[in-house]
């Protein structure tokens, strides 16, 4: 929303899907909306899925604002993802040791949060971290399983771009329904650009060539992640 205004990105994706891939069901999702105005603007533009991230606020403020936004979304037939707990960013914690007890989603509090706000999905914190920040040695699978038992609703995992297959499969088994992947795609894109430009005396000045290779690198990451998550080949089941 900050970089492209939202409307341009939405129009681009919607046009591509409707004209080239009409057989593929696509959700256009707002990730980590930080306030009511951003969520409202995304829905007015046409986004059919939104997230409000109030995880940096006090619990009472997060609950109150999330509840207000959930009502706004549901009146318009839009699902809302909330977040409880704190998935740290690298810029917030650096390389320091983290007291993970301060960051985790509390299962009982999550049950109350979902009941009071009426959200449709919950992003959880069980030792995961954004931007390749230092993670907990192992995710708190027991905590994740307890959250899943109490809520029985879609649970979302942020900050797991670097997870290997074993951790991912176990998280799915314990209740995760969706992984948000960002930094792994960025790394693939930038790494590809670096390889085609650095030290290449005959480098092309056709930016389309370099961006095409970077796009291909991101595509490979997405394909591998989809296979790891068990998401490949499911168009017919969700269409």
Go through each PLM region and give its residues.
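Active-site-adjacent substrate-binding region
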Residues: 154
């Amino acid at each position: 929303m900050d970089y492209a205004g939202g409307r341009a990105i939405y129009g681009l994706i919607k046009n591509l899907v409707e004209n080239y891939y009409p057989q593929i069901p696509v959700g256009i999702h707002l990730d980590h909306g930080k306030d009511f105005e951003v969520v409202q603007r995304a829905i007015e533009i046409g986004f059919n899925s939104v997230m409000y991230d109030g995880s940096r606020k006090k619990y009472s403020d997060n609950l109150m604002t999330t509840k207000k936004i959930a009502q706004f979304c549901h009146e318009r037939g839009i699902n809302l993802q909330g977040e409880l707990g704190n998935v740290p960013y690298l810029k917030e914690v650096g390389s320091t040791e983290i007291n993970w007890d301060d960051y985790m989603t509390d299962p009982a509090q999550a049950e109350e949060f979902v009941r009071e706000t009426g959200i449709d999905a919950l992003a959880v914190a069980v030792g995961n971290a954004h931007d390749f920040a230092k993670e907990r040695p192992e995710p708190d699978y027991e905590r994740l399983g307890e959250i899943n038992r109490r809520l029985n609703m879609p649970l979302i995992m942020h900050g797991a771009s670097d997870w290997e297959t074993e951790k991912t499969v176990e998280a799915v088994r314990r209740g995760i329904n969706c992984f948000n992947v960002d930094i792994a795609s960025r790394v693939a894109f930038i790494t590809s650009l670096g390889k085609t430009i650095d030290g290449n005396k005959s480098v092309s000045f056709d930016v389309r060539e370099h961006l095409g290779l970077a796009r291909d690198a991101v595509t490979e990451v997405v394909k591998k992640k989809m296979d790891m998550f068990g998401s490949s080949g499911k168009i017919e089941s969700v269409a």
